[in-house]
């Protein structure tokens, strides 16, 4: 297998992985009724890691990352995020969610609020940040995702790529320690995908701990320090990008890569 490529020069100077554990998943299982959607998931994520999760549709990859901030409830096993175990305790769930940002396939912006209001809503109401400070932070992150001029517009006035960059900026306004991305480009037109991936690369370059469900293998090659392949609710294989693409071990992984890389 040859390696995919991505048209972006990535600065890895700040991409340091520490020994500190950000996420620990042990023997996690989840069912939807009789359907066993996640099977004995074990995963350790260190602070500063950039992990891309790949796999066919229905493999459980989106469900797994949604369990990390309790958008989905696991039935057995342990999930510990930033030292906090995720149980049914609402206080623990709120603590974890305050440390974990999440960006979805669909942008989930409030259509009746301006872009600036979308970004300041959670900091003001959840973190009790003063309005002026929240607005300054929001403008800082809109600058970072390169759309400060859109602050007073409404979501419907922006392109899909711009809306997704707003969604990323909105998550960053809560100062998360970990960012989760659930197929953030799959609802975008092809010409808008790169602008969102470039924003995510910038986050990675700054040392953000990231888990990303994605189909862009060139992005995985450029940014990830680990690629995880899932199928049938299990982690089938995981490795650094070079070895994952050059020398996949599992037949299931080889089959998947041959389909998406076209050889």
Swiss-Prot record:
Where does it primarily localize? membrane
Residues binding ATP: 55-62
Which membrane topology describes this protein? Peripheral membrane protein
Domain annotation ABC transporter: ranges: 23-257
GO terms under cellular component? plasma membrane
Question: Which PROSITE patterns would you find in this protein's record?
Answer: ABC_TRANSPORTER_1 (PS00211), ABC_TRANSPORTER_2 (PS50893)
Compartments, as annotated in UniProt: Cell membrane
Cite the Pfam families for this sequence. Answer: ABC_tran
Q: List, alphabetically, the InterPro entries matched.
A: AAA+_ATPase, ABC_ATPase_HisP-typ, ABC_transporter-like_ATP-bd, ABC_transporter-like_CS, MetN_ABC_transporter-like, P-loop_NTPase
Q: What keywords does the record list, in alphabetical order?
A: Amino-acid transport, ATP-binding, Cell membrane, Membrane, Nucleotide-binding, Transport
Q: Which GO terms describe its molecular function?
A: ABC-type amino acid transporter activity; ATP binding; ATP hydrolysis activity
Q: What does this protein do?
A: Part of a binding-protein-dependent transport system for glutamate, glutamine, aspartate, asparagine. Probably responsible for energy coupling to the transport system.
Q: Per the similarity annotation, which family is this? A: Belongs to the ABC transporter superfamily.
Q: Summarize subunit and interaction data from the UniProt record for this chain.
A: BztB and BztC form a heterodimer which can form a membrane complex with a homodimer of BztD.
Q: What is this protein called?
A: Glutamate/glutamine/aspartate/asparagine transport ATP-binding protein BztD
- The encoding gene is bztD
